[in-house]
Amino acid sequence: MSESCANPLLLEWIKEWLDQARERNSKGVTVYKKAYESMKACPLVFQHPSEAQQLNGLGPKLCERLTEKLKAYCEENGLPMPEHPQKAAASKRTSDEGVDDPPAKKPRKAKPYVPSLRSGPYALLLGLATLDENASQGLTKAQLIEKAQPYCDSSFTAPPDPSKFYTAWNSMKTLLQKELVYEHGRPLRRYALTEEGWEVAKRIKKTLPGGDLNTLAFRHQTGILSIEQGDSSTHVRSNTSTSAAPGPRDNDNNIVAQESLNGNNDEPIQIQDNDRGRDPIDEIGIEPIILPANSFTIQLVLDTREVRSSKDRDYIANELSKKGITPEVRALELGDAMWVARCNDPTFLSQYGEECNEVMLDWIVERKRMDDLLGSIKDGRFHEQKFRLRRSGIKNVIYLIEEFAITHDVGSASAMKYQEMMASAIASTQVVNGYFVKQTRNLDDTIRYLARMTYLLQKMYCFSPPTHTLSLIPSRQLSSAQSYLTTLERLRARDPSVTYSVTFSTFSALTSKSDILSLRDVFLKMLMCTRGVTGEKALAIQKRWSTPREFVEAFERLDEKGREDMVFERTKTLVGRKKMGKVLSKKIADIWGTGG
């Protein structure tokens, strides 16, 4: 032990606890090490351990442990226990003033345990509370999970993400430690509530609303649609809140009524002419087909690559099914999730020359985990994907960012750098691109969001009366991707309340990475392969040099110095995100001007 320490006894005890924490590989190592260093460096002699609270790293709990240790040491060695400095000062002041001792404070009652809403302990207590209070038999783990899962936002069987190993079931340990639950039986363990556990469960049950907690159900009030999941509900007023999703505003006076979405409608579908109260769109030359509200159902479509892990590919679809949503899983050319209107009559669209019976809705989700977002920023996919989303013509793009554990030391330079990168990416996505950014805690939170969005779109397009109209742009009247975007822009400007779209197969062809690419598209994609060349910068270069050949020939006409500065000099009048510096100009010249 260091002879220079002013309080060697206290230092020795802290060292003992530090060594014990290291042996147990406990998280307390950091706490004890900090306290040890502070005590070792302190030049003051403490008469009582409570005086050590003034040191960095020594809090009330640690000082209390030191006091207990000192008390035991004094008793063992027949020494008087030093008086607490505050009590000594108070008794001295009292004796000086001749005033009686004030009454002792009543000990503060420990607060009753209250688990967080829809947490693991919360769900387990409610699951066990389904038993009769006087029942002698408990529930097995499998039985309890089945009853508790509807009350919990996290899964009892699968970790929140592949990098973690705990599930909501791990919270059973907390309930056992607090003696709210007891287990009995071997080898098949059964669980039941103790008397204290029943008291907590009864308090929780008083806060529960009526109804089935295992469904995402619609409940309509005056002017409000409530999409409920358990006892946590997201209220979506008829003017759609951005907390649920971006999008057009609905009429506040709409009364929401439940409609059957099973598509068993025997009545023939009648086409509504688009000249009802509107002028024909002569200048566009397009005649959209209006789909009646009762002629289709809303279907969620997921990309085949949207999986929980390589060994658990059906987790997302299975969890959505539990919430009453049966998704379609197929390869998507763009985005990770989207919604289509599937016609109840499979032959309805074929009479207009369409090869598909599904019409795209104006909503698409691009899902990114934190680690995937960082990777896409580094390799340029982030800007390329946003560029393709912008060219897709989809009006409501939801950029969903899912939290994920990233192994970096908090406070390190790399962690700070990555945090800045993500903050900048999120801000640019919202401000520059105008996309709605939704952040979720984990995959289960993402699944709940997709379910709520599906119900919201069903309400918008399928309920009677519908708040939104869906119109199909015939594929035969579109000649290219550019004509599709131009047509969309003009139709939306003419009637913003109508959703104009194309069939799913047409949309897939228009947004394909390889099919129907013009020379301009190929040139832009080639430019964006260079790190630092965003979609905006690529467009600026393409406007100045129309083709790759023209771009290369421009380099060939210059000497080496001229090639390095060519892009910078020819585009230096540009401002904002389109502006290119000399470093980027040289990088482009190294790629495109080599051998000129």
From Swiss-Prot:
Protein name: Crossover junction endonuclease mus81
Residue ranges of the TM segments: none
GO biological process, one term: resolution of meiotic recombination intermediates
Biased composition (Polar residues): 229-244, 253-267
InterPro entries registered for this protein in UniProt: DNA_pol_lamdba_lyase_dom_sf, EME1/EME2_C, ERCC4_domain, Mus81, Restrct_endonuc-II-like, WH-like_DNA-bd_sf, WH_MUS81, XPF_nuclease_Mus81
Role, per record: Interacts with eme1 to form a DNA structure-specific endonuclease with substrate preference for branched DNA structures with a 5'-end at the branch nick. Typical substrates include 3'-flap structures, D-loops, replication forks and nicked Holliday junctions. May be required in mitosis for the processing of stalled or collapsed replication fork intermediates. May be required in meiosis for the repair of meiosis-specific double strand breaks subsequent to single-end invasion (SEI).
Compartments, as annotated in UniProt: Nucleus
Cellular component aspect of the GO annotation: Holliday junction resolvase complex; nucleus
Major location (coarse): nucleus
GO terms for MF: 3'-flap endonuclease activity; crossover junction DNA endonuclease activity; DNA binding; metal ion binding
